[in-house]
Amino acid sequence: MLIDLKHGDAHAVFDMEAGNIPVWTIGGRSPLHVAPWRDEPEVQDDPNVADVDKRLAGDFFCMPFGRDDVHGHPIHGPTANAPWLMLNAEGSKGVFANTLPKMGDAVVAKEIRLVGESLLQRHIIDKGRGDVTFAHHPMVRMEEGGRLSFSRKRAAMTDPVAQHAGHNLWALNQVRGDLNLDCEDGGQWDLRTYPAGHVVEDFCTLVESRDNTLGWTCVMRNAEADMLLVLKDPAMMPVTMLWISNGARDFPPWNSRHTGVLGIEDGRALGGQGLAAAARDNRLSAMDVPTVLPLGEVHVIRHAMVSLPRPPGWSELSAVVLSRGTLTLREASGAEIAVPFPEGHFD
């Protein structure tokens, strides 16, 4: 069942069966990616493809994030693979719920709200037992690449194992103190540039600076001449995981046609290493970065996306400041724009 939400010229759709947001349009822009096989019958009927991949689109909430080698859920957990229950949906806001029996009947409530250029989400997690990883999973596609900007990070790292063996640009199992990752060929890659000219499948984890009160990632798309700003509460989501999917997956349903895609996956996890590893002492927990969320109490996870036209000449953000209902975006040149943003969302 598809639920429509509207505010002014903004329109979003929540797919209750898939748990994702396959449509978000605002001002003629469509910031989110939709997999090309989403409506292909042969993929939808394939029992070997997880539901989250069959209906891959937009943004969805993963719990647990990635591999669940504790409870045995499919990749990204029941919140990304099982139907949601609608509690209320009217106008610009929808509220939905999902229950996780294998995690002590933990309940996840999802609130989606459209306000101007922003798509706001809150996830309220209640009850349950044990520890769990989680992350948002918004995806954007770039026809001709783009430029990325980030809030301050104190580390960048890659997983010990590749997403698709032999198809990674970045060297495995590295930890860096800047945004320049070592590559398999001995060179370096600036994470602020999407690797549009490389057929690769890559993944890295960025660790938020300790003093950040607002975490953000900005993608400026070249061909589309727009920008997507993704905002997070860094206290709840101390890492940003970047998924690069640019044609390297040559097996069904991907078949080398999933190109130019970037996942901006803010959450609490040990990269792509699975729930069991995240629940143990690990290299992130050694940095005092939590990699799991303890169930059994109420947690509120706040996230937002803002879609804007890219001002002429802009290529990189140097700062994003939220104050009194206004987001101020500063470009590397010093130029600024102010964008209204709902007060209280990140309080």
Task: Give the location of each predicted region.
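Surface-exposed acidic/polar loop and edge beta-strand patches at domain peripheries
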Residues: 1-120, 131-347
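Asparagine-centered strand-capping/turn motif at beta-strand->loop junctions
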Residues: 124-128
